[in-house]
Regions:
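Conserved nucleotide-sugar donor-interacting segment of glycosyltransferase catalytic cores
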Residues: 1-63, 104
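Alpha-helix C-terminal capping/helix-to-coil transition sites in glycosyltransferase folds
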Residues: 10-12, 93, 139, 205-206
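A donor-sugar binding/catalytic signature common to diverse glycosyltransferases
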Residues: 19, 191, 197-243
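Donor-nucleotide binding loops and adjacent catalytic segments primarily
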Residues: 106-209
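Generic beta-sheet signal
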Residues: 38-41, 100, 119, 175, ...
Length: 307
């Protein structure tokens, strides 16, 4: 807020765009201008918010510690604004919300009114500088395995993948990131390509199934290329994403505690052999195509400013 105070001495702001987390809504209140929420994740259903200790209706209320209390008092004293409740820093609201997915994909979408604009994801078309023998994937069945770039300690999981798909009649591409110890991952047969990083979009353009933790960016990428999932959620919003993909018959979900050679093999076989997963993915892709994208976002912001 101090930075905002300094900037507004020389700049007349028309509106503010902010993330679902943090102090964005307080900046809107301080400047007394329209606010646009930018949400790259699902909107959180009201019934889930009510289970959080930060929610004003929670049975057991979260209480700020002494230091936090002093900072909140200082904020109100110096800037004349304060959070409406303890939940606000985790769940900002705006006059309108731009959501980077489709209303069809959003869980409990009926709970969110017309001021929530589902403009669809932004899929990067840029080429990466990562070298990869894409020609080896042509005209082959391809399993792509990636658990993102942040998870560590996944060496046992990757070893299970090697045991499971050592006889797979096709190519297995496994991206292990740089937080896992390559020396703890066993030697794989020739049908495996293992690397810290791979050009994900190019791999997905050839893949038949994607084994993933279910991060939203990777999920959107795979839907764009019509690749169904075996999804193994770990944390954050991944369980919600996995549940929704399963409901829409675009993924087979495995709990990470239940992953072994048998369950992983059965899951991949199910996704590769059952047409419902390809149909489910195509419906999701169609819902993205029908979204208004950046043009709709610009139009609704202009409409907000003209009110």
């Amino acid at each position: 807020l101090e930075i905002t105070k300094q900037l507004c001495e020389s700049i007349n702001f028309d509106f503010v765009i902010y993330d679902i987390f943090g102090a964005g809504e307080l900046v809107k209140e301080y400047l007394q201008i329209p606010g646009v929420l930018s949400s790259p994740i699902f909107l959180i259903p009201p019934e889930f918010l009510e289970t959080l200790p930060f929610h004003p209706n929670a049975e057991i209320q979260f209480q700020p510690d002494e230091t936090s209390g002093k900072l909140l008092y200082q904020m109100e004293h110096e800037f004349g604004v304060k959070p409406k409740n303890n939940l606000q820093f985790m769940h900002n609201k705006g006059d309108i919300s731009l959501v980077y997915t489709s209303r069809y994909f959003q869980p409990n979408s009926d709970a969110f009114g017309e001021n929530n604009i589902f403009i669809g994801p932004s899929i990067s078309k840029r080429k990466t500088n990562v070298e990869f023998p894409l020609e080896l994937l042509k005209n082959k069945k391809v399993i792509y395995i990636s658990m993102g770039t942040l998870l560590e300690g996944l060496e046992p999981f990757f070893n299970t993948c090697i045991d499971t798909f050592s006889d797979f009649d096709g190519i297995v591409v496994m991206a292990i990131g740089d937080r896992n110890d390559r020396s703890k991952i066993k030697k794989a047969p020739d049908n495996f390509i293992i690397a810290s990083y791979v050009p994900q979009s190019e791999i997905l353009s050839e893949a038949d199934v994607f084994i993933t933790h279910g991060g939203m960016n990777s999920v959107h990428d795979a839907i764009y290329f019509n690749v169904p999932f075996v999804i193994i959620p770990h944390d954050k919003d991944q369980p919600m994403i996995a549940q929704r993909l399963t409901e829409l018959e675009a993924a087979h979900q495995l709990l990470k505690e239940h992953v072994n050679v048998q369950t992983l093999n059965e899951a991949v076989t199910e996704v590769l052999s059952n047409e419902k997963y390809k149909h489910g993915i195509r419906k999701l892709n169609d819902s993205f195509i029908e979204c208004g994208g950046t043009k709709e976002a610009i139009a609704v912001i202009k409409s907000l400013l003209n009110k």
